């Protein structure tokens, strides 16, 4: 009951600010509500406050006591939705699939798959030594075990 009510309140807040979107909503047995959100242009503290107020002011503590935590998806968190991939086009990702693990630049993303590009050293077709080649792959989201944005300083 509480989860459905919180989901509806969150949807209403996200409709008012459509650059924000819900990543996860969890409610534990002690009625601790944890909302993780992300945004097309990132998430500010004011965005978290707005979402928190939009939910908290529409729930009755007299009816059911609760605690509320609203956070943004952290930089070290794996990407979990196509919309997160789209906002990170052009950035370097660390991608893990069932059989492989590699770093690549995110070239494009849609609702079903992503396109990645990276440079690899491979043996020359003729003679000794190696040559650098540009590789590209299209990966459906179903093949991705985990993908994180690589932070560079």
From Swiss-Prot:
Its main location: cytoplasm. It is found in: Cytoplasm. One of its GO terms (cellular component) is cytoplasm. The keyword Cytoplasm applies. InterPro entries: Ribosome_maturation_RimP, RimP_N, RimP_N_sf. GO terms for biological process: ribosomal small subunit biogenesis. Keywords: Cytoplasm, Ribosome biogenesis. The keyword Cytoplasm applies. Required for maturation of 30S ribosomal subunits. Belongs to the RimP family. NCBIfam families: PRK02001.1 (NF002531). This is Ribosome maturation factor RimP. It comes from Christiangramia forsetii (strain DSM 17595 / CGMCC 1.15422 / KT0803). The lineage of its organism: Bacteria, Pseudomonadati, Bacteroidota, Flavobacteriia, Flavobacteriales. The gene is rimP.
């Amino acid at each position: 009951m509480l989860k459905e009510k919180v989901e509806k309140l969150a949807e209403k807040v996200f409709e008012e600010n459509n650059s924000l979107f819900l990543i996860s909503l969890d409610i534990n047995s002690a009625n601790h509500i944890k909302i993780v959100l992300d945004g097309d242009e990132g998430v500010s503290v004011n965005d978290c406050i707005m979402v928190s107020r939009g939910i908290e002011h529409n729930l009755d503590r007299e009816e059911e006591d609760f605690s509320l935590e609203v956070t943004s998806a952290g930089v070290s968190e794996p990407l979990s939705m196509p919309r997160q991939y789209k906002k990170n086009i052009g950035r370097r990702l660390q991608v893990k699939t069932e059989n492989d693990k590699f770093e690549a630049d995110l070239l494009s993303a849609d609702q079903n798959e992503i396109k990645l590009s990276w440079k690899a050293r491979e043996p020359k077709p003729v003679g000794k030594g190696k040559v650098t080649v540009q590789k590209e792959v299209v990966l459906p989201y179903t093949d991705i075990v985990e993908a994180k944005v690589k932070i560079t300083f």
